[in-house]
Amino acid sequence: MSFSVSDHKNSKRVRSINLKEGDLDRLVFPFKKHSITSLEYKPFSRFSLAKSLDEVFDNKLSQTLVKILNDRETGTAIVQPEINNKKFDKDFLVKLSTGLAYLVGNPNFDSMTGKYYARFSVKHQDSSDSYLRKAYTNLDLHTDGTYVKEKTDWLIMTKMEEQNVNGGDSVILHLDDWEHLDELSNDPVGQQNFIWGSPKSKNIDYKVEHPVFSKDKNGKPTISYID
């Protein structure tokens, strides 16, 4: 296996996957076969891209990702590509992220952008209604997919560039580490249906109804919530 997997320095629940520069070099040619426009309009090309990615890693990368994401003890992976060359530009990162996503499954359609993925900037000032674009706004406890009809199992986010700023790491909390989980997941209110809607920028014109807490296949609590 030509990539390495280790525990993240901050949490054993997070697995770090290191992709070496030499292997990324082998992706440059197959990635150039697919333009960003082609990926946006031809769903099959995304699966083809993912196949090329997996073949570089002897078809072991997909198995590793699926195993990590399906293991409740982890469920999170940080992919760390060794990128020290200008040939690994923003388009390359979009393609790499696309390949990783399609090794796991078929991503949901993003209504906000009208594409299979969303791409945006976090700036010093922002007038939108999206917390994701506001540099100094803390995100409250939430799960993605709360207000859409599609089932949302996983989320992939890619930091493509930083200018005039350092840090900007994502903040995540494993549900089993939440100190209020037992209390709230067993409260009858958490089992009742709530109506969920989204801000205008998301371009979703319907509302959904479901409880905050449900159970997974092993009877452990899951959560679908956004404030």
Give, region by region, the residue ranges found by the protein language model.
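Preference for protein termini
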Residues: M1-S2, L65
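Active-site environment of non-heme Fe oxygenases that use a 2-His-1-carboxylate facial triad
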Residues: S2-F57, R72-E73, F120-D227
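Short, charged beta->alpha transition segments
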Residues: S62-V66, T143
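A structural signal for short, well-ordered beta-strand segments and their strand-loop junctions
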Residues: A77-Q80, D110-M112, I156-T158
